[in-house]
From Swiss-Prot:
Zinc fingers classed as B box-type: ranges: 93-145
UniProt keyword annotations, A-Z: Coiled coil, Cytoplasm, Metal-binding, Zinc, Zinc-finger
Subunit description: Interacts with the core-glycosylated, but not the fully glycosylated form of KCNH2/HERG. Interacts with DNAJA1 and HSPA8. Interacts (via the C-terminus) with HSPA1A; this interaction additively increases KCNH2 expression.
Record function comment: Plays a role in cardiac repolarization possibly by stabilizing membrane expression of the potassium channel KCNH2/HERG, or by assisting its synthesis, folding or export from the endoplasmic reticulum, in a heat shock protein-dependent manner.
One GO molecular-function entry: transmembrane transporter binding
Main location: cytoplasm
Disulfide bonds, paired cysteine numbers: none
Binding, Zn(2+): C98, C101, C127, H132
Gene name as annotated: RNF207
Gene3D superfamilies: Actin interacting protein 3, C-terminal domain, Classic Zinc Finger, Zinc/RING finger domain, C3HC4 (zinc finger)
Protein name: RING finger protein 207
Length: 594
């Protein structure tokens, strides 16, 4: 069964309305019929609880507390107190039969009916005047019908004697015969009904005061919790608004920096693309010129005789030398890598918003939250993904933050005379003094608390006033030291900024060195590929020369065995001898190497 019977409280004023009538069942909303009391002190009608028992337990429909039930009925015991209140209430008045006229009185007559305690009979208003008019009935005790249960002495069901005593030990009423049956020790706990009534009223008053105090504390707790619920809602709204505002600001900053970075990348791309295309166009016009001169050289060697060779050969050699010695931009003037340092740029644009310095993982705000006792914001640090372009570089690994004492000792052990080291020395002295005073106060307060709780010793007010005064003075000293340390932030921030710029410059130079070495490696691989492509043609020309001029066989063998020598000679501007040999085939041309 659901326990949602009462509506949620809307405010402190709804507490009284939510309590309901004490004689009305909260389930059926009618007057109790055989009210049953649960262990949680909630009452319900026996009919309302019937059928709710499971495994010998019944769950309270209001608070869901489990109550163990015993007996074949499967119901909790009847609440005798609440049943008495129900029977004594106005709604529980039974039909009245007058002892004189034996007629049922109407509801209006029942309200004016009386009861003669002396006769022990109910009387209607008319019969009371008729039967008790004589002087002999003047001493009869006549009360209202509703007061009869309070004033009439009840009788013992065992001995049919009126109750005269009350046992404070067994909490039971006793007649004279019950009193005689008790032992001597038990009789000492028996008092008359009037005294027992007075004592019971006093104890009941004390219990009522305790319940009222608990009621007042409960109302205050409810008011406090309702205020905290409102405060939590308001705090959640403020936090959500701050998150949205920060997120929007971060998006705006990132979008602006993204546009600038993309613009810078596009500018670098256009610049490098234009430079490479211009150089490629120059080399594209140079390659046919070289091809033509090689064909001219081969044709000249095959067609010219010795006289023609000596007449025009040196002119051809000068032309070839001029072609080779002209400045040609064979090496790329720029690298093909476009670097925008986007990670550092994004971090730099987010630094003012997130209060994260480039040299510290968490800012001063996180430390302040930790000192204040708050949980502080939890920063989710994920593994940094390496850039697909910058494969050589790696993200710096964040070292775990050392405790303050250990890190300070390590810093002071280095022996460097820096402003921060001098500040740490001064801070350690001040901190140890403040820590010693706090520990002294703590020990003194703990000792006083132990004397007060365990030994119940009397503590003078002067001692407490002195401790309070020392605590306030120590608090002022801590505030002063905190302000002094906080005032050094600007000085150290400038020093840290200079160090960071120096480290950033060193990192940039280091990355440039790696890029230069990588570029040299690429150029060397390109030259190796070109050499492998030229080697077969060098060997072919050497074999042709060997067949035409046997005297050049030795030199041709040397050149075929060492093709790298011919390649180096061509790089130095010297014409290999194999290219000047007559009979070279014009079709033996080196491939186009791009």
């Amino acid at each position: 069964m659901s326990g949602a019977i009462f509506a949620p409280l809307e405010g402190p004023g709804a507490l009284d309305a939510a309590s309901g009538h004490p004689l009305v069942c909260p389930l059926c909303h009618a007057q109790y019929e055989r009210p049953c009391l649960l262990d949680c002190f909630h009452d319900f009608c026996a009919g309302c609880l019937r059928g709710r028992t499971a495994d010998g337990r019944v769950a309270c429909p209001l608070c869901q507390h489990q109550t163990v039930v015993k007996g074949p009925s499967g119901l909790p015991p009847v609440d005798r107190l609440l049943q008495f209140l129900v029977d004594s209430s106005g709604d529980g008045v039974e039909a009245v039969h007058c002892a004189n006229c034996d007629l049922d009185c109407s509801k209006q007559d029942a309200e004016t009916a009386c009861f003669c305690n002396t006769c022990g009979q109910p009387l209607c208003a008319r019969c009371r005047d008729e039967t008790h008019r004589a002087r002999m009935f003047a001493r009869h005790d006549i009360v209202a019908l509703g007061q009869r249960s309070r004033d009439v002495l009840q009788k013992c069901p065992l001995h049919a004697e009126p109750y005269l005593m009350f046992s404070t030990d067994k909490k039971s009423l006793l007649c004279i015969r019950c009193f005689r049956d008790l032992q001597g020790e038990s009789r000492a706990h028996c008092v008359d009904l009037e005294s027992a009534y007075v004592q019971g009223c006093e104890r009941l008053e004390q219990a009522v005061l305790a319940v009222k105090a608990l009621q007042a504390a409960t109302r205050e707790a409810i008011a406090l919790l309702q205020a905290m619920v409102e405060e939590v809602r308001r705090s959640a709204e403020e936090e959500a608004a701050a998150i949205h505002a920060l997120f929007d600001s971060v998006q705006e900053k990132l979008a602006e920096r993204k546009a600038l970075l993309l613009q810078a990348v596009q500018s670098q791309y256009e610049e490098k693309d234009q430079a490479f295309k211009e150089q490629l166009s120059h080399l594209a016009t140079l390659l046919p010129t070289l091809q033509i001169h090689l064909v001219i050289c081969s044709s000249f060697l095959s067609l010219a005789n010795k006289a023609e060779f000596l007449d025009l050969g040196y002119e051809l050699m000068e032309r070839l030398q001029g072609v080779v010695t002209r400045p040609h931009r064979l090496r790329p003037a720029q690298s093909s890598k476009i670097a925008s340092d986007y990670r550092a740029e994004f971090a730099r644009c987010l630094e003012p918003l997130l209060l994260l310095g480039p040299r510290r993982a968490t800012g001063a705000q996180g430390g302040a939250n930790t000192l204040a006792g708050g949980s502080g914001p939890k920063v989710l640090m994920g593994p940094s993904c390496p850039s697909p372009v910058r494969k050589v570089s790696r993200s710096p690994v964040q070292k775990p933050t050392l405790p303050r004492s250990i890190s300070t000792k390590v810093l002071l052990a280095d022996g460097e005379d820096t402003p921060f080291a001098e500040h740490c020395r001064h801070y350690e002295d001040s901190y140890r003094g403040l820590q010693a005073e706090v520990q002294n106060l703590k020990d003194q307060v703990q000792e006083l608390h132990r004397d007060l709780t365990k030994h119940h010793s009397l503590i003078r007010a002067e001692i407490m006033a002195d401790i309070l005064h020392r605590s306030l003075r120590l608090d002022a000293q801590i505030d002063s030291e905190y302000a002094s340390v906080e005032g050094m932030r600007a000085v150290f921030q400038e020093i840290w900024e200079e160090s960071y710029q120096r480290l950033a410059g060193e990192q940039e130079i280091y990355e440039a060195q790696l890029r230069d070495l990588f570029q040299l490696k690429q150029e060397n691989a390109h030259l190796t590929t070109i050499t492998k492509h030229i080697t077969p043609y060098v060997r072919s020309i050497a074999k042709v020369k060997e067949r035409l001029e046997p005297r050049f066989q030795a030199s041709a063998d040397d050149e075929s065995e060492n093709p790298q020598t011919a390649y180096d000679a061509s790089r130095n501007g010297e014409t290999p001898a194999s290219l000047l040999l007559p009979g070279s085939v014009a079709s033996a041309e080196p491939p186009f190497v791009n």
